[in-house]
Each structure stands twice: as C-alpha cells, then as structure tokens.
A protein has these predicted regions:
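Short carbohydrate-recognition loop motifs
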Residues: 228-252
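Extracellular carbohydrate-recognition regions
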Residues: 193-223, 403-422
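Early exported N-terminus immediately downstream of N-terminal targeting peptides
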Residues: 21-104
C-alpha cells in the first residue's frame, strides 16, 4: 500500500458555504497537485497543515484502533469510578489522536517527495447531506491506483473520515503496523512512542492529574494503605514531579503500565532525595527504609507472587550493593544512589532491566510488564524521608548501545524557583 499516507492529500479545502461540488473538488485537487512541485521544506509544512485542518483525526483514530484504549486501561476499571475511568480513557484518546496526526503528517511529507508520484485525478463526487464520497485516481509514472475518500461535514468544514486505496482501508494498514502492540494491550504511551518513531517511551512525566496535585494513574498498591494519609502529590512548574514525604506510614503507590521489556530494556529516571531516613539499611527489618525506591513489576510466578526488582537511594548501603532481606518473597534491591553526597540534587539513573532480571529473577522477562511502584518511607527507623521522582522512561538497547540515552533531568526545579542545570529533555 505505497500510497497509504499520501492519500491524505485528498483533504478537501473548506468551501465558505459548506457545499462540496465537483468544481470545488477539482480546484482542490489541482491545488494539491501543484504542491508536488513545491520545495521539500514547504511540503513538510503543508503536510502538517493538511492533516491538521482536513482530516477527521478522532474518527480516523477510532476506526484504526477501535477499543484498544479501553482494553489497555482495563486494570483501572475496578479501581476508579465510572466517570474517572471515562476521563482517563478520554485523556489518552486525545493524546493518541495527536500522536496519530503527527504520524500521518510525517508519512505524507515523505510521500510528497516521491519522484514516482505524478498527481491525482478526480473521477466523481457524491454528497448526501453531511456525508460525501470522492472517487479519484492516484497517478504514478507507470500505473495508477483507485482512491476513495469518505467525507464528513462537521464544525463548518469537510473532513476525511476514511480512505481506501484499491478498496483497502488506510486505517487497516496502520492497525496492522501496530497490531502486536494492540493485541498485547501495551499501554498508550508505548503506542504514542511508536507512532512518533522514538527510541524511548515516556512511562510517566506526572503531567496528568485529577485536581492539579493527585496523579491520575497512581494509587496505594495495597488495600490496607488506601485509608492512610496521602503521602504523594504532584508538584512543580513547568516540569512536574512526584513529591513523597513520610515519617510513619510506608505507603507504596503503584501504576499499571504495560510495555515489552525485551524491546525497551533500559530504564532511566530522575529523582532527588531531600531527607534520608536515619540509619536506613535495606537488609534490616528494623531499619528497612529508603529515601527513594522504584519498583518494576515484570510479571507473576505460578503462585501469583510478583516478579519484581527494586532500585533504591539508600542511607547507609554503598552504591552498587545488590541484595534482599532474608524473608519469603522479598524483592531484590539494587542501590543506585547512596548517602548524602547528592542530597538535594536531581540525579539521572540508568539501569538495564533485562540484565538485572536475568541475574536475579532468571531468564528473560515476560513480554508484558505489570506496572511500577514508588516508595519513600521512614517508619522502621522512626525518622523522616523526603524525595521527588520525575520523568520515567524506557529505551531500546540500540539507543543505549549507540550512546543516544541522554540525561533528561534538565529544567526540574530544585527549590525556591531554582532549576537544575543538566541537559534539557
């Protein structure tokens, strides 16, 4: 389906009176054909405008992805009220539509530069109220293809709701392109990253909240903790982060997020410890507190016990320490920051999830993770801990091996309007 994106050129201009007729459509096709002669720099901008202004992106995305969002977010259905679950789905629906729009624009810009494409010819146009259908031929140097555009008139403009090339829907092509991800119900940020053709997935940037401070997808992981005080809240402008403060409660907050850790095995994040629990030592029951802790829950074993790893900022254990408490089902932990040397500073962390899974949990990780957890606690030491978490990402191994995994902690506020000076994202 070589023309899969170029057919967005069928986007029809907006007649001032809302009518669609053959003369207007012919003029539009002529204008779009003229665009093929424009410089490449102009084509890219024109592709973005055409898709933005003339494609019914919401309808196109719904036809392409169906109920993918509802299925990928289904774990929240029993945890959120019906209005909140609907709001969560709508939040990601809007993000997915924007990502899809950018993908179509980028593909169209490439097709506009194809030397083999000669133009479009309008064969017929039928209009019935708020719906219409255009039949065209896409002309190439040695062949032509039939193109059918379903049109919808909404908000005072005609837009394309679906396209077919020689009878094959363009939406079906894109669905097939991402079929594996859709079938495995990986989380929306993964699909957004693949639509953007990025080498990393932003698992969490804490930009989405219910009320400005309560993170949209995070909540107490254990039922017994749901009645405890809220220890975590989103803060910061313009870049946001999760603030955690604890003295006696020790609440893990979790988020369901599903990605393939074989495809994206490198995890990076930013965190800052402001107060270390006194004498914290992750090996000891009576001192098992960490200023900051990040859990990665890969899967469950045959007993239903989570297969997970924990990365910590320890008060006393040296960086590089790996271990776990001598109790049943306790997770392996990795000390990636230690002590007060970097206290008050945003630090950038990089870990190889696949390597650590193989070393401590055995074999390769499952192809779909369960989620993430955060824990700042000081209950065992009866002291106080405070930390901040930001910008959790996973990367391809190719990006890591190629040196393209970069520090993305720049611009995070330290305190009183002072910002970190690391590289911007």
């Amino acid at each position: 389906m070589k023309l899969l994106s170029a057919v967005v050129l069928l986007a029809l201009a907006n007649p001032s009176d809302g009518r669609a007729d053959a003369a207007w459509a012919t003029a539009t096709v002529a204008r779009l054909n003229a665009l093929l002669e424009a410089p490449n720099s102009e084509r890219a901008g024109a592709a973005e405008r055409l898709v933005s202004e003339h494609l019914a992106v919401d309808e196109f995305a719904e036809v392409t992805f169906g109920d993918y969002l509802e299925k990928s977010l289904d774990a929240y259905r029993g945890l959120l009220s019906s209005p909140r679950f609907t709001h969560l789905v709508d939040h990601y629906r809007s993000r997915l539509a924007r990502a899809y729009q950018h993908r179509l624009s980028a593909d169209l810009a490439v097709q506009l530069a194809s030397p083999d494409w000669r133009g479009l010819r309008l064969d017929s146009l039928e209009v019935n109220g708020q719906r219409g259908r255009a039949q065209l031929r896409a002309l190439f140097a040695t062949r032509s293809l039939g193109v059918e555009a379903d049109l919808i008139f909404a908000d005072g403009t005609w837009k394309i709701a679906e396209l077919k090339i020689d009878g094959r829907p363009v939406s079906s092509h894109y669905r097939r392109r991402y079929q594996s991800l859709i079938d495995r119900e990986h989380s929306p940020p993964v699909l957004e990253a693949q639509l953007a053709e990025r080498e990393f997935v932003v698992l969490e940037d804490f930009a989405a909240t219910w009320d400005g401070s309560q993170p949209m997808e995070w909540g107490p992981w254990k039922k017994k903790d749901r009645q405890k005080p809220v220890l975590y809240r989103v803060e910061g402008r313009p870049r946001r982060y999760m603030a955690a403060r604890d003295s006696s409660h020790s609440v893990i907050v979790g988020k369901f997020v599903h990605w393939n850790p074989r495809q994206y095995p490198i995890m990076t994040w930013c965190w800052r410890a402001a107060a270390l629990p006194l004498g914290g030592n992750e090996f000891l029951d009576d001192a098992n507190d960490s200023a900051a802790g990040l859990y990665v829950i890969f899967s469950k074993n045959w007993l239903g016990v989570p297969k997970q790893l924990k990365y910590v900022w320890s008060t006393t254990l040296p960086e590089g320490t790996v271990g776990r408490r001598d109790k049943l089902f306790r997770p392996w932990f990795f000390v990636v920051e230690s002590g007060a040397a970097n206290l008050g500073k945003w630090t950038f962390e990089v870990v190889d999830l696949e390597k650590h899974h193989r070393e401590k949990l055995g074999g390769r990780p499952a192809k779909r993770t369960i989620g993430l957890g955060l824990l700042t606690d000081a209950n065992s030491t009866r002291s106080y801990a405070e930390a901040y978490y930001a910008d959790l990402r996973v990367w391809t191994r190719q990006a890591f091996d190629g040196g393209r995994v970069v520090n993305h902690c720049g611009g995070l506020p330290v305190s009183n309007g002072v910002y970190s000076g690391e590289n911007s994202p």
